[in-house]
């Protein structure tokens, strides 16, 4: 059974917890008799976060009150065909009393690409592991930054394990500085349940240039790209379906970052004061270094040339193609400095939050 049900009076935070515990991406909102009132999807929650809803808000404020659903009697193949046509990941199955029997996921009948009822939308993943990690020296004098250990496991091994868990088995790792340490450890990836191919950067190619060295003929569907210094518990399948359902060319995962201004801020128009806001907080969505990219965009990246992800974003926007942001509520950190490395190690040793695989 895929059914996860909550009350309309439960909070958004409760819905997030229910999704994370169940490894699902859709919860049914029901009354006391189990009659469907609406649904809350992983995407609904993330769109609410973009709109600055508080996590203590009742789910009745963000739920879809007219959801797509199935009546009993359809085959699994028929339901999957309908979901795919409508670019929907999942839908509840109702009985004649409008009570929820189950939730059908588009990946439920596919072998080899499912995890907990989910199907990966990604044809491949690329781990960008070619950086030097200069700010972490001397720790990186003879070791690439992604091979640094946090909680007894290297950063990049955590990524490989997470990708495998989410059904993403086709992995490319871009390497340059001390790249042999990575290839010697993972080899072909078979001992980790994945297939790994290495992309050698002979020179610095920026944050996206190495993608031009990957043949898009070796996989189908969009690619997942993740920086090699990121530790996260993001649900890659939720990210993939968010990208798919929004029909985007490129999707950017982003973390909420709050800046507290320690002073009263004067609001003005020219020399005229309009008011004072005492010690305001500003919220920003910051790039998490995780992307979903349609495979045809790879051919638009200059071959073996320096090219940053910001350049790719600008190109897609210039071509008037769609880019969406995927706000994360999962654990995330990037290991860019010694202080960040030490903080992550302390978090894992204290088991702060649900950060272990």
Predicted feature locations:
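N-terminal glycine-rich phosphate-binding loop and ensuing alpha1 helix
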Residues: 117-180
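Catalytic-core segments of class I nucleotidyltransferases/pyrophosphorylases
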Residues: 224, 231, 237-244, 257-260, ...
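A glycine-centered beta-loop-beta connector
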Residues: 19-22, 27-44, 83, 91-109, ...
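A short, polar/charged loop-to-alpha-helix boundary motif
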Residues: 45-60, 107-122, 285
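Bateman (tandem CBS) regulatory domains
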Residues: 1-4, 11, 57-67, 140-143, ...
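Conserved N-terminal catalytic core of the sugar/cofactor nucleotidyltransferase
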Residues: 153-227, 238, 303-304
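A short, conserved acidic/glycine-rich loop-to-beta-strand motif
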Residues: 246-256
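The conserved cystathionine-beta-synthase
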Residues: 5-23, 30, 49, 69-88, ...
